[in-house]
Amino acid sequence: MFKRISLRFTIAVLLAILCASLSSKLEAQNQSPRQGRFAAHEWGTFTSVSTANGIPQMWSPLTGPSELPSFVYHTSGRCGKGSQRTLALVRMETPVLYFYSDSNVRASVKVAFPKGCITEWYPLARAESQTIEWNDFVAQPGARENFPVDGSRSHYYPARETDAVPLSLGDEQKGEQEKFLFYRGIGFSEVPLSVKLKDDQVIIRNYGPDEIARVILFEKHGGKSGWRIHEALKGESTIARPALDQPLEPLLREFEKTLVGQGLYEKEAAAMIKTWRDSWFEEGLRVFYIMPRSATDTILPITIKPQPQELVRVFVGRAEIITPEMEKQILTAAQLSCENSPEARATAINTVRRYGRFADPVLREAMNNAKDEASRVSINELMKELAKPADRQ
């Protein structure tokens, strides 16, 4: 009898050890790259803006930490007169593609954007309006890192804070090196999630065929913030606007947990959050959601040669909502800017700047509805002033 009990106890202990070992191995896979594999990991964002009643807006950013270093290549007008000021439904921002390998790998990448336009990229690539190709670059584990810098405080740089291998294009003297492949663009098709504000309820709807793994509703006003999480969205759901009494740090941990759960390594998730923290959690009301992989592959089909043994693509959708409160404050500021007073104009700029890049559609509508030409000119000048960096105003 005692032998049977002892045997059962031994088996139970061995099973517990085995489960713990498997759990730790699975956890470790999300913390750092696996050895002996050629892998590619990508993260990026899709940003859209809609009115409170859910109408998608054509928009261009007025302000915000989206400026890129001077060495980044751009379209030189192929997507309009300055991609930053070109109106679009969706802005595809900071996709970065990392590679992992134990030995040198010569590779090529092609990304298509059928319903959009590629606007910026680095390193040097063959870029046309709807496609971008990096041909014959080398993933070089252990190579001396000699990445370009321009002395700016661009949010581009935190994306380098990962264990990805350096990538080199061209020869050592005239070539370029970076920790990732970077590209950005503007799109003209709607995203799979719509948002609508009704009283204190946010109505979210998944129009796509696949489940959206996680949705985060975030709101911030006057320095106070709150958030709510909705899991596994299919069809339509309603989320109450949060009380603005929650600290940000728990949300940052939830964000990192979400990104790692989708396949990013911990350092990649941390780099993404560091890149976007200032912009993601500014004043306003917005919905974040994990783009279904099928939607990402449809919007941005990608080809990598040689084919990696692992390809992870994690895109965060950001749906900005123009609330009635936000619209009222911006319109009041627009009227204030029409007064012939430097003090009034400074107040208008400070009011609108709180809403970062997303005041554009409200100001554009105010300009269209202005009663006289002088008001239209004043609002247009306000928009131009807001488009400048803060230190040049």
Predicted features and spans:
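Bacterial N-terminal signal peptides that target proteins for export
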Residues: 2-12
